[in-house]
Structures are given as structure tokens and as C-alpha cells.
């Protein structure tokens, strides 16, 4: 009898629990036992000693691991087909002087740290900043007008002012100086008023309280018509009664009553007025609506800062009332719409306020319970002891109390629907776990006739999507995620609303898909076929083009004869989307510039990149502070990508020169630097070593798919000569960015053109150019502010 033939398949053994697993399951980073015991990070598989030998050939997994990356980096990132790692093997925590926050796996920050090309750019920025503080400090003197701006902006302003004196064209000089000074003055004033402290809060409330006639006859009707549909958290009658009661009491007494909740009502009036002001200001209709001129004459800049001061004075962190909760939600809404940095550069502040709002909802009973058992709510004891509830029932007969109960329950349901929707949206934008940890599938609520009530029926799908992502973000199953997104989009199509909220929801879904696709594209290629990798690459470019078309339509094709008072709201999601596309496109151009022999696609992408930046900064840079802060960063990046044949070579040249000179010892603790330096030592240290060979050894990159992709860009989607009169992106900081890059570009061209294989040792012996240290010093605004704001004597 012939012996049974054994299967010739190597057994993989866990390094922790010594359990075996079949090689077909190797794509999973860790065994189930180690995951259960919390030993995921130390779980690795090795070939069982009894099965080593044979012909001595490496398995595909072994050959992939010997490609230069450290075992942890290579192994954690290895996944089976259909799965993607959104974490890049780590949970990144960012910090600056005023905040510490974790980077969500779907956020724009995640795009930067997931792509090692962009991370190298970030590390390079850190190193350049530290070396340039003293040089920038000498140029930091600015006038008192810009005193409230960050030091990072002050120094660039000073450098730019030097360049104005050298302009040749009088017209361009006058135009540039006017725009430059207008932007600086405007943002400086807004930052000052938005961050000011009030010595006497009640006196400030009296000073800024909107006149009764203007608020009741101008502001409140506009709020009900244009803003309240976007955030339906008020009963219109209750709101009117409360506001009129405040004005009556203030007229009689001449002061506010804390016991009656007057300060919360004042904060509500201020925030409502500010939101209406923003709605009118960002309307792009060419026909001026003169009935709102009185509102535009108000100085609403300090209103949000004053509301922040008024809210805690009613013991908000200890207890809460319904008007306080509504005011908090209104403040959250304002922070999202604010042209200043209300939610933070990475939306990190939104979760803090959302957590407070969620706790307040639970405290007053606005939760899923209001949908499950609405008939069981009894507000009798609240009516008897709380004047805010009494106002809702004041004009009702005893027999109408039941209908009043129903109106309050309905208000609770609307508040919960709004809070739930905001929580899910922020989670889908950032990838962070949602604050509200439960969901349900309620019946349709046709009686509400608003967007948030419709979205309640979709919440269980959003919850499933976020659960799939957050259960194990290092191994997201695309076969589970994609159908959920498709079903959400299909269900959204059933609601025929063309409101700003529908536009925002669709754009958020597209950003989720874009982030997941980006993670799949830059992930390890050892377990992905060349055809699949090219497919991801092409789809990524197609999505970038598609989203850019949405941006162009949004800015250039709005109806100019109809008022669009909702643009103050949708501008924010468009800004978030454009910035994410901008970051991804930067990484793609970096890869093409440094890893592809076929450079035919780079000029096309650079033209597209310039047009996208021009659209972003010309449409949003005049009004939005976060966009303004990124202007110089984007200008320097563009010049590096455009004028340098191999940007990665430039960055590696700088970093290794610093290592050799002993200036970067502390930075070796950073994982990427430690990885690069470790591989550098393994490959011969100071011997003649091609830096690009070193980089490609660490980050193997498939970049042979450019042929034929130029056809994607044959149709010109950007309007020609749209900003021919004055292009903010092209003109602004032109002198300063040239000053930072001029010497380095010359050095790079000489090094790469004449000796592409220049060794690290030879480069380190060369003298540093005077402006090379400034090249990327302001690439990351947060880092730049962190270092420069700590200089003694600076404000």
C-alpha cells in the first residue's frame, strides 16, 4: 500500500503561545489567542524548526520581509487581499502647546503618517525648524497690528515685506500690498476678538446685547428661515417667549438675573445673531438683499468668545437645563461654521464639546429612550420647579398639557437626532470611535419633515460602518465595509432633499471611501498583484479628479440670482475635503518624483496640483484662518515638487548631514529616523551608499503604472484664467518661498544632475547653503508654532 503523501506546506508557529497556524492564514497579523491576551504587538510567526531546510529557498513571505523594512513595520502591515490597514501599525498621538489628541484613522492627519513619503516630509520639517529658530527670531519684528497672530505667521510676514520692496511692477506691488495687508489685519483682528478675555462678563453682555428691534424683527426671522432648518433644536414659540421675556425683564430691572437663566438666553441671542451674520456674509448671490444691511453692520466677532464666558457661569459642569443644552449645541454648530479655527485644525476640539453635549443629553433624558418609549415621559415635576419648562406651558389650558408633553418629547427627539447625526459625521470624518455607543432602527418619522429625522432610520448603517472600522482598524475588511457604504448611499437616494445637509453627507461618504482607498494603495505590495495595485492607483486618481470637479462646481457654478444662505455651513466640509485631496496628491507626486522611471505623468499632476491649490486658497483663503495658515506651507511644497527632480533625495541629504554632524541624536528615538539610520548602518555606514537605494530598501514602491494614465486628465476641468487678475496662491509669499528654496534647488540640481549616486559621506562634507535650513521650516504649522512660540520675549 502506497503511503499517503503529506501536504508540502510550512507550518507557522506563534512566537508567544507557540500555536501553529496554516500558511493560508498568514495574512492575519496576530493569532486569536494573542489578541485575546493582549499580546498583539509581540505576536510574530516563524517557520517551525522541523520544517526548515529543503532547497533553502525563501518563502514569499520571507522574501518580502528581507526587503529592508524592520520586522514590525513589514509584518504588521501585511494583510490578505480584501483587507486594509488604516493604522500603519501604530496609534499616533499628536501634541502641541495647548492640546494633545489622537489621530483618527480616517482623518487627514492619518494620510500624513500612513504614507512614509509624507512622514519623511514631516520629520524633515521638524529637523529644519529646530535649526532655524534663531535665524527667524532675528527677522521677527512686526508692527503692533499683527501682535495677535502666531509667531510663525509674523516671521513669514516680515520676510514677505522685504520682498515687496523689490517688486518691479507698480501695479502688482500695489495690488499685492493691499491684499497682503488686508488679510493680515483682518485675521489679526478676528483672532484678537475671538480670544479676548472679559474683565466684567455681565457688563460685556449688556454692551453686546443686540437691540430688541433688530433681533426680533431682523435676526430671528432670518434665523428661522435660513439657519434653524440646519439645526432644528428649538421650538419656535418657546424660543420667542424666552427671548421676549429676557428683553422685558432687562428693560424693567436694567440687569440680568442668573436665577432666571438670563445669561444663557443672552448667549443664545449672541450665537443666533452670529450665525445669521455668517449666513448673510457668505451668500454668493450677486443681488444684495438690503433688508439684512442692519445685521451686516453689527460687530459679531466677539459674540462667540462672550458666549464661552457666559455658559460656565451657570454651573454648567455640574448640572444642566434644556436651554443650556440647546446653547451648547448652537455653539458646536457655530464652531463648525466659524471662519476661524473653532473646531481645531484636525477637528480635535469637536470631540471635547460633543462629549459634554452627550452627557447633557443623558442628564435631561434626551436619548434613544425618547424614541423607544415617548409616551412614558412625564414633565409635571419639571414644570413645577423650572421656569424654563413653565414658559412652554404658560399659555395653555389644563386640558392642553398632554399636547404640551408631546411637543417637548418631539423637541427631545429632534435634539437627539441632531446630536446623533453630528456624532456619526465627525466619526466618519476622523475615524475615531463615536461617542454615542448604541444604535437602533426606529420606525419612519414622516411627521417631522426634516433631514435629521430621516437620518435616524439610517443610523444603524452608520453604526455598522464605524463598528467595522473601529473593531480592528489595522485589518479592515473591505468586503464588509463597501456594501455598507453602498447601502447608505442607496438609502440616501430615497430622500430627495437637495439641502446643504444632503450635500455634506454625500461628501463625507466620498471622503471615507477616499481614505480607505488611499490606505489600500500605499499598503504593502507583496500580497497584492500588480494589476490590483494599478487598479487602486488609477481609482485614486479618478476619485481625486471627481472630487475636484465637485469643488469646481461648488465654487464656480452656483446660481447667482438665488440667495444661498447655507454656504456658510457647507464651506467647512468642502474645505476639509479639499485639504485631504491636497495631501494625498502631494504624496502621489512625491512617489512619482522619487520612485518612478517614467516621469511623463508628473507635469500633468503638477499642473493639476497648482490649479487645485489656486482654487483652494483663492476661494477660501481670504475668509478662513486655517486655510490662510496653510498658504505658505503649500507654496513651499509646490516649489519643492516643481523645481526639484528628486525631493526625497533632498530630504535624505539633509537628514543624514544632520546625523553625521551630531545634531539629530534626539531624533533617533523617532521610529522612522531609527529605521532609516539602522538600515544605513547595516548597509555600510559611511561607505559609498546611494541614498535612493537606501530609501527603496526601506520603502519598496511599485511605480511602473504611469503609462496611459495621462488620458485621465485629457479633459480640462479647471476654468482657464479664472484667477488671471490676481492669484492668491501664486502671488502670496512668493518672495519668502523663493528665499527659502533658491540655494537648495541649485544644490539639488547640481548633486542629482552631475552625480546621481552621491554618497552620504561626500554630501556631509559639503558646506550647508545659507537658506537650506529654512527650506521646510514652516511645512507643518502646528510644529512651527510649537517651537517659535516658546522663544523668550515673544508673544
Curated annotation (Swiss-Prot):
Keyword Ion transport: no
GO molecular function annotations of the record: DNA binding; DNA-binding transcription factor activity, RNA polymerase II-specific; zinc ion binding
Species of the source: Eremothecium gossypii (strain ATCC 10895 / CBS 109.51 / FGSC 9923 / NRRL Y-1056)
Functional description taken from the UniProt entry: Transcriptional inhibitor with a significantly increased number of target genes in response to oleate.
A GO BP annotation: positive regulation of transcription by RNA polymerase II
Cellular-component GO terms for this entry: mitochondrion; nucleus
Cellular compartments annotated: Cytoplasm; Nucleus; Mitochondrion
Protein name: Oleate activated transcription factor 3
UniProt keyword Lipid metabolism present: no
PROSITE patterns in alphabetical order: ZN2_CY6_FUNGAL_1, ZN2_CY6_FUNGAL_2
Pfam families recorded: Zn_clus
The entry's keywords: Cytoplasm, DNA-binding, Metal-binding, Mitochondrion, Nucleus, Repressor, Transcription, Transcription regulation, Zinc
Annotated SUPFAM superfamilies: Zn2/Cys6 DNA-binding domain
UniProt-listed InterPro entries: OAF3, Zn2-C6_fun-type_DNA-bd_sf, Zn2Cys6_DnaBD
Family to which this protein belongs: Belongs to the OAF3 family.
Main location: cytoplasm
DNA-binding residue intervals: 14-43
Superkingdom in the source lineage: Eukaryota
Amino acid at each position: 500500500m502506497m503511503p499517503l503523501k503529506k501536504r508540502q506546506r510550512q507550518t507557522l508557529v506563534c512566537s508567544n503561545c507557540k500555536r501553529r497556524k496554516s500558511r493560508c492564514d498568514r495574512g492575519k497579523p496576530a493569532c486569536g489567542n494573542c489578541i485575546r491576551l493582549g499580546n498583539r504587538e509581540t505576536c510574530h510567526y516563524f517557520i517551525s524548526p522541523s520544517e526548515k531546510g529543503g532547497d533553502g529557498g525563501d518563502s514569499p513571505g520571507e522574501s518580502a520581509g528581507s526587503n529592508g523594512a524592520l520586522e514590525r513595520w513589514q509584518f504588521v502591515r501585511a494583510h490578505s487581499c480584501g483587507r486594509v490597514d488604516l493604522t500603519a501599525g501604530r496609534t499616533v498621538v499628536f501634541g502641541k502647546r495647548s492640546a494633545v489628541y489622537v489621530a483618527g484613522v480616517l482623518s487627514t492627519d492619518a494620510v500624513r503618517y500612513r504614507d512614509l513619503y509624507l512622514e519623511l516630509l514631516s520629520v524633515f520639517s521638524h529637523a529644519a525648524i529646530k535649526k532655524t529658530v534663531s535665524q527667524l527670531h532675528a527677522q521677527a519684528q512686526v508692527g503692533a497690528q499683527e501682535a495677535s497672530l502666531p509667531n510663525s505667521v509674523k516671521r513669514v510676514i516680515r520676510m514677505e515685506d522685504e520682498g515687496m520692496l523689490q517688486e518691479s511692477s507698480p501695479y502688482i506691488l500695489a495690488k499685492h500690498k493691499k491684499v497682503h495687508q488686508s488679510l493680515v489685519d483682518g485675521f489679526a483682528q478676528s483672532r484678537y476678538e475671538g480670544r479676548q478675555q472679559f474683565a466684567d462678563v455681565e457688563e460685556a453682555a449688556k454692551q453686546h446685547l443686540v437691540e430688541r428691534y433688530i433681533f426680533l424683527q431682523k435676526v430671528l426671522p432670518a434665523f428661522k428661515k435660513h439657519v434653524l432648518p440646519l439645526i432644528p433644536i428649538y421650538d419656535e414659540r418657546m424660543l420667542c417667549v424666552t427671548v421676549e421675556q429676557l428683553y422685558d425683564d432687562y428693560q424693567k430691572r436694567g440687569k440680568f438675573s442668573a436665577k432666571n437663566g438670563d445669561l444663557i438666553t443672552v448667549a443664545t441671542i449672541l450665537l443666533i445673531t452670529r450665525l445669521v451674520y455668517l449666513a448673510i456674509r457668505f451668500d454668493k448671490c450677486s443681488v444684495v438683499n438690503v433688508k439684512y444691511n442692519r445685521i451686516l453692520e453689527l460687530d459679531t466677532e466677539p459674540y462667540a468668545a462672550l458666549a464661552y464666558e457666559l455658559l460656565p457661569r451657570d454651573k454648567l459642569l455640574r448640572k444642566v437645563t434644556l436651554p443650556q443644552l440647546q446653547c451648547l449645541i448652537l455653539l458646536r454648530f457655530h464652531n463648525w461654521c466659524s471662519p476661524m479655527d473653532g473646531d481645531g485644525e484636525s477637528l480635535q476640539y469637536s470631540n471635547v464639546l460633543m462629549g459634554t453635549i452627550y452627557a447633557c443629553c443623558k442628564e435631561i433624558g434626551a436619548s434613544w429612550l425618547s424614541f423607544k418609549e415617548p409616551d412614558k415621559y412625564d414633565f409635571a415635576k419639571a414644570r413645577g420647579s423650572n421656569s424654563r419648562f413653565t414658559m412652554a406651558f404658560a399659555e395653555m389650558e389644563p386640558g392642553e398639557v398632554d399636547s404640551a408633553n408631546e411637543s417637548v418629547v418631539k423637541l427631545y427627539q429632534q435634539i437627539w437626532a441632531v446630536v446623533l447625526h453630528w456624532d456619526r459625521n465627525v466619526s466618519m470624518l476622523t475615524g475615531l470611535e463615536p461617542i454615542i455607543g448604541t444604535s437602533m432602527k426606529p420606525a419612519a418619522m414622516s411627521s417631522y419633515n426634516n433631514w435629521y429625522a430621516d437620518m435616524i432610520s439610517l443610523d444603524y448603517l452608520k453604526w455598522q460602518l464605524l463598528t467595522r472600522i473601529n473593531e480592528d482598524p489595522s485589518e479592515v475588511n473591505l468586503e464588509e465595509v463597501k456594501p455598507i457604504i453602498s447601502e447608505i448611499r442607496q438609502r440616501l437616494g430615497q430622500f430627495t432633499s437637495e439641502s446643504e445637509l444632503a450635500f455634506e453627507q454625500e461628501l463625507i461618504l466620498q471622503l471615507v471611501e477616499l481614505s480607505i482607498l488611499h490606505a489600500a494603495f500605499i499598503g504593502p505590495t507583496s500580497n497584492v498583484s500588480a494589476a490590483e495595485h494599478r487598479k487602486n492607483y488609477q481609482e485614486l486618481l479618478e476619485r481625486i479628479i471627481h472630487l475636484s470637479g465637485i469643488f469646481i462646481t461648488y465654487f464656480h457654478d452656483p446660481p447667482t440670482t438665488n440667495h444661498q444662505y447655507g454656504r456658510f455651513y457647507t464651506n467647512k466640509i468642502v474645505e476639509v475635503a479639499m485639504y485631504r485631496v491636497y495631501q494625498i496628491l502631494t504624496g502621489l507626486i512625491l512617489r512619482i518624483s522619487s520612485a518612478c522611471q517614467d516621469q511623463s505623468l508628473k507635469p500633468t499632476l503638477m499642473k493639476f496640483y497648482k490649479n487645485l491649490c489656486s482654487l483652494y486658497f483663492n476661494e477660501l483663503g481670504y475668509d478662513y484662518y486655517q486655510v490662510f495658515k496653510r498658504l505658505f506651507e503649500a507654496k513651499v511644497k509646490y516649489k519643492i515638487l516643481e523645481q526639484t527632480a528628486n525631493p526625497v533625495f533632498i530630504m535624505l541629504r539633509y537628514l543624514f548631514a544632520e546625523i553625521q554632524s551630531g545634531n539629530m541624536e534626539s531624533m533617533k528615538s523617532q521610529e522612522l529616523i531609527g529605521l532609516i539610520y539602522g538600515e544605513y548602518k547595516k548597509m555600510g555606514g559611511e561607505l559609498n551608499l546611494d541614498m535612493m537605494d537606501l530609501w527603496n530598501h526601506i520603502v519598496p514602491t511599485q511605480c511602473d503604472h504611469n503609462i496611459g494614465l495621462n488620458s485621465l486628465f485629457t479633459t480640462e476641468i479647471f476654468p482657464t484664467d479664472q484667477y488671471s487678475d490676481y492669484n492668491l496662491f501664486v502671488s502670496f509669499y512668493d518672495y519668502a518661498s523663493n528665499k527659502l528654496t533658491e540655494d537648495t534647488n541649485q544644490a539639488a540640481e547640481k548633486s542629482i544632475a552631475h552625480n546621481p549616486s552621491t554618497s552620504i559621506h561626500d554630501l556631509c562634507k559639503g558646506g550647508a547653503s545659507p537658506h537650506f535650513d529654512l527650506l521646510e521650516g514652516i511645512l507643518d504649522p502646528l510644529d512651527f508654532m510649537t517651537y517659535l512660540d516658546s522663544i523668550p520675549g515673544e508673544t
